[in-house]
C-alpha cells in the first residue's frame, strides 16, 4: 500500500505562546511493500509524522495519500484507515493487560466485530507471523515472558488486525542485543513473507542498516535527506552536521580505505564487513 505525503505541516498549540511547528512542509513517498525507516534526534518530528499517517493527528496543512486516498479529507472515515494502518507505540508491552497471550492478541480483532472463528484464526496466524508457537504460548500470562517476547505479543496484537501498513516506533528500545536481532528478524519477515509495508522509527544506525530499503532523515521538523542505504549512509558529513552518525563498522571501513585497502565503501553491517575483509585478505594471498 503506497503512501505519499505532500507539503505536510503540523503545528502544536497554534495561536498560543506555546506554539511549535513539529513538521514543516514534509514531502515523502513510500512505495508499496517497502521497508522505510525514519531517523533523527528526539524532537525532529519522527513520532509526530507517524501519528499523522495513522490519522491520530490531523495536519495543519498538506495531504497524506494512503493507497491514493487523501486521509485528510473530511469525508474519509479514520476508523477505516486505522484498519489498514497499524501503529505500535514505543514500549508496547506496557499496554498488555489480559490474563493470557491468546486473549490479549484477540482483543483488537474481537473489537472489530469479527466472528469468534475468524478471531481465533487471526490470533493463530499473528502468533506464527511474529515467531510465537501457538500451543506453547496461548495460555501463558503475558507477564511471565521476557521483554522481547512481550514485545512480540504486543506486535502480534496489531498484526492480528491485518493491516496493510505496519508502523513501529523504536521497536527494539530497551532490549538486549539478541532481543533486538530477534525483533528485527520478525519485522523484516512480515515485510518479505506477508508483503506488508513497514515504517520504522529508530535511533540505532546498526538496526537501520539491517532492515531498511529507504531511509528518511528528520531534522528540525523537516526531512533533510532520503534515499537507500548507500545514498544516505555515504552522506557522512551531512549526518554528522545534524548530530547523527553511520554504523560504527562503516567508520572502520573508511579508515581501512584511507590506509590503502581496496574495500568497498558501501559497507554498513558487521556481516558485510566480515565478507569484504575476508575477500581482501584472500586476494592478498594470491
UniProtKB/Swiss-Prot annotation:
- Name the predominant localization: membrane
Cited CDD domains: ABC_cobalt_CbiO_domain1
| Membrane topology qualifier | Peripheral membrane protein
Question: Known EC number(s)?
Answer: 7.-.-.-
Q: Which residues bind ATP?
A: 40-47
What does the protein in this record do?
ATP-binding (A) component of a common energy-coupling factor (ECF) ABC-transporter complex. Unlike classic ABC transporters this ECF transporter provides the energy necessary to transport a number of different substrates.
Subunit-level organization = Forms a stable energy-coupling factor (ECF) transporter complex composed of 2 membrane-embedded substrate-binding proteins (S component), 2 ATP-binding proteins (A component) and 2 transmembrane proteins (T component).
Q: What name does this protein carry? A: Energy-coupling factor transporter ATP-binding protein EcfA2
Q: Which organism is it from?
A: Clostridium acetobutylicum (strain ATCC 824 / DSM 792 / JCM 1419 / IAM 19013 / LMG 5710 / NBRC 13948 / NRRL B-527 / VKM B-1787 / 2291 / W)
Amino acid at each position: 500500500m503506497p503512501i505519499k505525503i505532500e507539503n505536510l505541516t503540523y503545528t502544536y498549540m497554534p495561536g498560543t505562546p506555546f506554539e511549535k511547528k513539529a513538521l514543516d512542509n514534509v514531502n515523502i513517498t513510500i512505495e508499496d511493500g517497502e521497508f522505510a525507516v525514519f531517523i533523527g534526534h528526539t524532537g525532529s518530528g519522527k513520532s509526530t509524522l507517524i501519528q499523522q499517517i495513522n490519522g491520530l493527528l490531523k495536519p495543519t496543512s498538506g495531504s497524506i495519500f494512503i493507497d491514493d486516498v487523501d486521509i485528510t479529507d473530511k469525508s474519509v472515515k479514520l476508523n477505516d484507515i486505522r484498519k489498514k494502518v497499524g501503529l505500535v507505540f514505543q514500549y508496547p508491552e506496557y499496554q498488555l493487560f489480559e490474563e493470557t497471550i491468546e486473549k490479549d492478541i484477540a482483543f483488537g480483532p474481537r473489537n472489530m466485530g469479527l466472528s469468534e472463528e475468524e478471531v481465533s484464526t487471526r490470533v493463530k496466524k499473528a502468533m506464527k507471523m511474529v515467531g510465537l508457537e501457538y500451543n506453547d504460548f496461548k495460555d501463558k500470562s503475558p507477564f511471565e515472558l521476557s521483554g522481547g517476547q512481550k514485545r512480540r505479543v504486543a506486535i502480534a496484537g496489531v498484526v492480528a488486525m491485518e493491516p496493510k501498513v505496519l508502523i513501529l516506533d523504536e521497536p527494539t528500545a530497551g532490549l538486549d542485543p539478541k532481543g533486538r536481532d530477534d525483533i528485527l528478524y520478525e519485522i523484516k519477515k512480515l515485510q518479505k513473507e506477508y508483503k506488508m509495508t513497514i515504517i520504522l522509527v529508530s535511533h540505532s544506525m546498526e538496526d537501520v542498516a539491517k532492515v531498511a530499503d529507504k531511509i528518511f532523515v528528520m531534522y528540525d521538523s523537516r526531512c533533510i535527506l532520503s534515499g537507500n542505504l548507500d545514498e544516505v549512509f555515504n552522506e557522512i558529513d551531512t549526518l554528522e552536521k545534524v548530530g547523527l552518525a553511520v554504523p560504527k563498522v562503516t567508520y572502520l571501513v573508511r579508515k581501512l580505505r584511507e590506509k590503502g585497502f581496496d574495500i568497498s565503501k558501501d559497507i554498513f553491517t558487521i556481516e558485510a564487513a566480515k565478507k569484504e575483509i575476508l575477500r581482501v585478505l584472500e586476494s592478498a594471498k594470491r
